[in-house]
From Swiss-Prot:
Organism: Bacillus subtilis (strain 168)
Membrane spanning stretches: 2-22, 34-54, 55-75, 94-114, 117-137
Membrane-protein topology: Multi-pass membrane protein
Name of the protein in question: Protein CcdC
Gene that specifies this protein: ccdC
PANTHER family associated with the record: PROTEIN CCDC (PTHR39164:SF1)
Protein backbone atom coordinates (compact mmCIF):
# COMPACT_ATOMS: atom_id res chain seq x y z
CA UNK A 1 0.00 0.00 0.00
CA UNK A 2 2.81 2.44 0.91
CA UNK A 3 4.48 1.77 -2.45
CA UNK A 4 1.30 2.82 -4.25
CA UNK A 5 0.86 5.95 -2.12
CA UNK A 6 4.50 6.98 -2.56
CA UNK A 7 4.25 6.36 -6.32
CA UNK A 8 1.16 8.57 -6.56
CA UNK A 9 2.98 11.28 -4.59
CA UNK A 10 5.97 10.94 -6.94
CA UNK A 11 3.69 11.40 -9.98
CA UNK A 12 2.11 14.50 -8.42
CA UNK A 13 5.56 15.92 -7.63
CA UNK A 14 6.72 15.28 -11.21
CA UNK A 15 3.68 17.09 -12.58
CA UNK A 16 4.38 19.99 -10.20
CA UNK A 17 8.02 20.13 -11.37
CA UNK A 18 6.89 20.23 -15.02
CA UNK A 19 4.40 23.03 -14.34
CA UNK A 20 6.96 25.05 -12.36
CA UNK A 21 9.59 24.48 -15.05
CA UNK A 22 7.25 25.66 -17.81
CA UNK A 23 6.17 28.75 -15.86
CA UNK A 24 9.73 29.57 -14.79
CA UNK A 25 10.92 29.68 -18.39
CA UNK A 26 8.95 32.93 -18.70
CA UNK A 27 11.04 34.59 -15.97
CA UNK A 28 14.77 35.36 -15.83
CA UNK A 29 16.97 32.89 -13.97
CA UNK A 30 19.06 33.93 -10.97
CA UNK A 31 21.81 32.12 -9.05
CA UNK A 32 19.47 31.90 -6.07
CA UNK A 33 16.83 30.05 -8.11
CA UNK A 34 19.47 27.52 -9.16
CA UNK A 35 21.21 27.01 -5.82
CA UNK A 36 18.31 27.00 -3.34
CA UNK A 37 16.47 23.78 -4.36
CA UNK A 38 19.32 21.41 -3.35
CA UNK A 39 19.81 23.39 -0.13
CA UNK A 40 16.11 23.05 0.70
CA UNK A 41 16.20 19.37 -0.23
CA UNK A 42 19.21 18.77 2.03
CA UNK A 43 16.94 19.18 5.05
CA UNK A 44 15.53 15.78 4.09
CA UNK A 45 18.80 14.26 5.30
CA UNK A 46 17.38 14.66 8.80
CA UNK A 47 15.43 11.48 8.07
CA UNK A 48 18.68 9.59 8.66
CA UNK A 49 18.56 10.53 12.34
CA UNK A 50 16.01 7.72 12.63
CA UNK A 51 17.34 4.14 12.37
CA UNK A 52 14.42 3.02 10.18
CA UNK A 53 15.89 5.07 7.30
CA UNK A 54 19.52 3.96 7.71
CA UNK A 55 21.20 2.37 4.69
CA UNK A 56 24.40 0.39 4.31
CA UNK A 57 27.49 1.89 2.70
CA UNK A 58 26.88 -0.19 -0.43
CA UNK A 59 23.25 0.97 -0.66
CA UNK A 60 24.39 4.58 -0.26
CA UNK A 61 26.97 4.24 -3.05
CA UNK A 62 24.52 2.47 -5.36
CA UNK A 63 21.80 5.09 -4.85
CA UNK A 64 24.13 8.09 -5.11
CA UNK A 65 25.91 6.73 -8.20
CA UNK A 66 22.60 6.04 -9.93
CA UNK A 67 21.47 9.58 -9.06
CA UNK A 68 24.63 11.04 -10.61
CA UNK A 69 24.07 8.94 -13.75
CA UNK A 70 20.44 10.11 -13.98
CA UNK A 71 21.59 13.73 -13.55
CA UNK A 72 23.40 13.53 -16.88
CA UNK A 73 20.05 13.44 -18.69
CA UNK A 74 18.82 16.50 -16.79
CA UNK A 75 22.08 18.36 -17.42
CA UNK A 76 21.88 17.68 -21.17
CA UNK A 77 18.34 19.12 -21.37
CA UNK A 78 18.86 22.20 -19.18
CA UNK A 79 20.09 25.03 -21.35
CA UNK A 80 20.01 28.81 -20.98
CA UNK A 81 19.51 31.59 -23.48
CA UNK A 82 19.83 35.36 -23.41
CA UNK A 83 16.69 37.39 -24.14
CA UNK A 84 16.38 41.14 -23.59
CA UNK A 85 19.73 41.24 -21.81
CA UNK A 86 18.58 38.62 -19.27
CA UNK A 87 19.21 34.89 -18.87
CA UNK A 88 16.28 32.48 -19.28
CA UNK A 89 15.88 28.69 -19.25
CA UNK A 90 15.27 27.31 -22.72
CA UNK A 91 12.12 25.23 -22.98
CA UNK A 92 12.93 21.64 -23.82
CA UNK A 93 10.44 19.00 -24.92
CA UNK A 94 13.04 16.36 -24.10
CA UNK A 95 13.06 17.49 -20.44
CA UNK A 96 9.44 16.42 -19.97
CA UNK A 97 10.09 13.01 -21.54
CA UNK A 98 13.23 12.52 -19.47
CA UNK A 99 11.41 13.48 -16.27
CA UNK A 100 8.59 11.04 -17.06
CA UNK A 101 11.12 8.36 -17.99
CA UNK A 102 13.01 8.82 -14.72
CA UNK A 103 9.72 8.66 -12.84
CA UNK A 104 8.76 5.38 -14.53
CA UNK A 105 12.21 3.93 -13.79
CA UNK A 106 11.88 5.05 -10.16
CA UNK A 107 8.44 3.45 -9.76
CA UNK A 108 9.59 0.18 -11.36
CA UNK A 109 12.73 0.12 -9.19
CA UNK A 110 10.71 0.82 -6.07
CA UNK A 111 8.26 -1.96 -6.91
CA UNK A 112 11.06 -4.47 -7.48
CA UNK A 113 13.28 -3.42 -4.56
CA UNK A 114 10.42 -3.21 -2.06
CA UNK A 115 10.30 -7.00 -2.00
CA UNK A 116 13.87 -7.30 -0.73
CA UNK A 117 14.72 -4.01 1.03
CA UNK A 118 12.95 -2.63 4.09
CA UNK A 119 10.59 0.25 3.24
CA UNK A 120 12.43 2.76 5.49
CA UNK A 121 15.83 1.95 4.00
CA UNK A 122 14.31 2.05 0.52
CA UNK A 123 12.92 5.52 1.25
CA UNK A 124 16.39 6.58 2.38
CA UNK A 125 17.93 5.16 -0.79
CA UNK A 126 15.50 7.04 -3.02
CA UNK A 127 16.20 10.28 -1.16
CA UNK A 128 19.94 9.69 -1.71
CA UNK A 129 19.28 8.93 -5.39
CA UNK A 130 17.27 12.15 -5.78
CA UNK A 131 19.91 14.19 -3.95
CA UNK A 132 22.65 12.58 -6.05
CA UNK A 133 20.69 13.65 -9.10
CA UNK A 134 19.79 17.23 -8.15
CA UNK A 135 23.20 18.33 -6.82
CA UNK A 136 25.28 17.63 -9.98
CA UNK A 137 22.43 18.95 -12.14
CA UNK A 138 22.24 22.22 -10.24
CA UNK A 139 26.04 22.58 -10.11
CA UNK A 140 26.15 22.16 -13.91
CA UNK A 141 23.30 24.65 -14.28
CA UNK A 142 25.08 27.17 -12.07
CA UNK A 143 28.34 26.83 -14.01
CA UNK A 144 26.47 27.25 -17.30
CA UNK A 145 24.62 30.26 -15.88
CA UNK A 146 27.87 31.87 -14.67
CA UNK A 147 29.48 31.39 -18.08
CA UNK A 148 26.54 33.03 -19.84
CA UNK A 149 26.33 35.76 -17.18
CA UNK A 150 30.03 36.59 -17.65
CA UNK A 151 29.55 36.73 -21.43
CA UNK A 152 26.57 39.03 -20.94
CA UNK A 153 28.56 41.26 -18.57
CA UNK A 154 31.53 41.50 -20.93
CA UNK A 155 29.28 42.33 -23.90
CA UNK A 156 27.58 45.06 -21.83
CA UNK A 157 30.95 46.50 -20.84
CA UNK A 158 32.11 46.52 -24.47
CA UNK A 159 28.91 48.30 -25.53
CA UNK A 160 29.50 51.12 -23.02
Amino acid sequence: MMIIVSSIIAVLMAVAVMVVRIKSSDKPVSPKKIILPPIFMSTGALMFLFPVFWVTGAEFLEAFTLGVIFSIFLIKTSKFEIKNNEIYMKRSKAFVFILVGLLVIRIVMKSILSTSIDYGALSGMFWILAFGMIVPWRIAMYLSYRKLHNELQSSNIQMN
